[in-house]
């Protein structure tokens, strides 16, 4: 067991210096305390740095708090990312997500959520989302969700766009080895008015190594697609990151 964890730590440390092609997608499903009752908190972060001809730093810090009762689950996620070049801040982004889940004795639960992000990494100034939907428990490790969301997005040129979308997501977190889990989260968000040509989607694949009950190391690959991106933005970007999480 100890030998296996040492191998996991070696791989994670080796990947800390992996270049991030874009800011990593925040995985809302990650570290959910579903099925547990009580107050839970977690802190996670990642760092990419290089020194030499060009000094560069890129960090992400995320705080999460869950407050679960017998009938209601609620959680809040706050994240901050920053890029520095030769000591000067060239980009920074922030993310906020709050969600309330109303549980019952069936496998179908209802949820309300709000989200706000400012992310120049993807060429938009801000994006605000409010949604109402349901969450279906497929089995003990897989979930399927659907919601109606209202999106208010403003690009870097201060052009504002409001869109009504469907939000469809699938999440699976299954054990592939002792204390090792493969985490998959997929989101598809088509516009209700333009179902074919205006679609946002993202996929997050992570290998989670549970060092102990409090510490988790995640190796994550994420990909984001937007069929109708903001002006001068690419339709697709990717990121590779190593994340360390502490639960308390």
Label for each model-derived stretch:
Residues 39, 70-76, 106-110, 140-144, ...:
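Repeated loop/turn-to-beta-strand initiation elements of outer-membrane beta-barrel proteins
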Residues 39-41, 57-63, 94-98, 128-132, ...:
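Hydrophobic, lipid-facing positions within transmembrane beta-strands of outer-membrane proteins
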Residues 40-46, 62, 75-79, 101, ...:
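Transmembrane beta-strands of outer-membrane beta-barrel proteins
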Residues 47-49, 65-69, 102, 136, ...:
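Residue-level signature of outer-membrane beta-barrel architecture
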Residues 47-51, 69, 80-84, 114-120, ...:
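Transmembrane beta-strands of outer-membrane beta-barrel pores
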Residues 49-57, 85-91, 118-126, 156-162, ...:
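Solvent-exposed loop/turn segments connecting transmembrane beta-strands
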Residues 207-210, 236-248:
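Outer-membrane beta-barrel "beta-signal"
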């Amino acid at each position: 067991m100890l030998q296996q964890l040492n191998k996991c730590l070696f791989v994670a440390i080796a990947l800390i210096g992996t270049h991030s092609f874009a800011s990593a997608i925040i995985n809302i499903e990650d570290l959910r305390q579903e099925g547990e009752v009580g107050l839970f908190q977690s802190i996670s972060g990642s760092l990419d740095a290089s020194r030499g001809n060009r000094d560069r730093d890129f960090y992400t810090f995320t705080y999460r708090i869950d407050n679960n009762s017998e009938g209601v689950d609620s959680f809040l996620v706050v994240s901050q990312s920053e890029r520095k070049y030769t000591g000067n801040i060239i980009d920074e982004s922030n993310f906020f997500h709050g969600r309330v889940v109303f549980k019952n004795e069936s496998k179908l639960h209802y949820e309300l959520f709000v989200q706000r992000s400012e992310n120049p990494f993807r060429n938009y100034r801000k994006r605000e989302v409010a949604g109402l939907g349901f969450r279906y428990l497929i089995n003990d490790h897989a979930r399927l969700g659907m919601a109606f969301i209202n999106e208010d997005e403003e690009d870097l040129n201060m052009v504002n766009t409001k869109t009504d979308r469907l939000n469809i997501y699938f999440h699976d977190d299954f054990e592939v080895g002792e204390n090792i889990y493969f985490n998959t989260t997929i989101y598809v968000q088509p516009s209700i008015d333009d179902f074919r040509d205006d679609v946002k989607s993202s996929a997050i694949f992570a290998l989670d190594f549970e060092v102990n009950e409090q510490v988790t190391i995640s190796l994550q690959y994420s990909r984001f697609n937007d069929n109708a991106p903001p002006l001068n933005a690419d339709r697709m970007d990717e990121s590779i990151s190593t994340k360390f999480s502490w639960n308390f």
